[in-house]
Design a protein with these regions (language model features):
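Short, solvent-exposed mixed-charge patches
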Residues: 215-217
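Beta-strand-rich extracellular modules
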Residues: 61-63, 189-193
């Protein structure tokens, strides 16, 4: 029979292991999105989320467009070896140009905690503005979510809900020719996750840069 001390040690070790796993998961959070990649070998594809330390080999003529989620820096890189790092990429043997664009970090209205509290009221009625987590400057967002299906329901107008297949955790409304109404409020649902977004009244149509229309549910 196990002694009380042995059980305490086992419990402590289990707690320590869970803590280490949580830290590792946090460290492995995506910090960038690969908007486009051409002429490069490897496993990476368009709209992949990238973590610190990820490497992309572009060879001599391959190219990639990478958007950084926190800094809103968008890079166009030709050739070389790219290593994902906080804020911007490290590029060896290639050419890179950078610009700052509108992105999720500048579009968020509510923090995740505030959005969670807002969701508990089940979005019962207006004003919808108080439930909005993100204002999106594009009519066709790129939604990343867990699950197999995304439901899009307009809150401020009587319209049929739209259901979109999630492929690899992504639903690109631009690729599906789905445009949401500028100024409209929409509830996004995937599995047990929900959030409310507002489409900016001046939102642009079409496939804008991915990081400018990215919504992470």
């Amino acid at each position: 029979m196990r002694s009380k001390l042995s059980l305490q040690i086992a419990g402590f070790c289990a707690t320590l292991l869970l803590g280490c796993l949580s830290v590792a998961e946090a460290d492995a959070a995506a910090i960038a999105i690969l908007e486009d990649i051409q002429g490069a070998a490897g496993k990476h594809g368009a709209f992949d989320e990238l973590k610190a330390g990820d490497r992309i080999e572009l060879g001599t003529s391959g190219s990639a467009v990478i958007g950084y989620l926190d800094s809103c820096v968008r890079e166009t890189i030709t050739g070389g070896i790219v290593t994902i790092a906080p804020g911007q990429s490290q590029v060896e043997g290639g050419a890179v140009t950078r610009e700052t664009v509108a992105c999720e970090a500048t579009q968020l209205v509510l923090s995740e905690e505030e959005a969670g509290k807002s969701a508990t009221v089940s979005f019962r009625g207006p004003p919808w503005e108080k439930h909005v987590r993100q204002i999106v400057p594009a009519q066709s967002p790129l939604v990343m979510a867990a699950g197999k299906q995304l439901e899009i329901k307009r809150l401020d107008s009587e319209e049929p809900a739209q259901k979109v297949k999630l492929t690899g955790g992504k639903a690109d409304l631009a690729a599906g020719n789905i445009a949401l109404t500028p100024g409209g409020f929409y509830q996004l649902t995937a599995g047990d996750r929900q959030m409310v977004i507002k489409i900016d009244p001046a939102a642009q149509p079409g496939a804008l840069p991915a990081m400018s229309r990215l919504v992470r549910l």
